[in-house]
Amino acid sequence: MKILFLIFTFQFCLALPFLFPSEDEEHKIRNAMPEKTTVKPAKLHKALIYSHASGFKHSSIPTGAKALRIMAEKTGVFDATFTIKTEEFTKKGLAKYDLIIFNNCTHIQKAF
């Protein structure tokens, strides 16, 4: 059992650099984002950002999430809630949000 744990830990450590955007990628994202919107929204919108992939796990999911986080931060147009869970996908849960963004989701058609 210990050897399996060590193997898993080692594999996870090897994959860690690929789980998050690099500093260079984040810098490029920040530079590409506008500092402000062209039209000021009447209110701060609440966004649910869903990033679950049931099949192939796209390596761009963390980059997309980072870009959306930076966009929310820089523009102030929306407040983002990030999730990979489906608990919010109820009538009551969705009523809290103005918009839903599906970030590289796969194999979710049957769920919705």
Role assignments for model-derived ranges:
Residues 5-15:
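Bacterial N-terminal signal peptides
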Residues 16-44:
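N-terminal pre-domain segments of enzymes
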Residues 16-19, 49-52, 56-112:
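Helical hinge/lid and interdomain linker segments adjacent to catalytic or ligand-binding clefts
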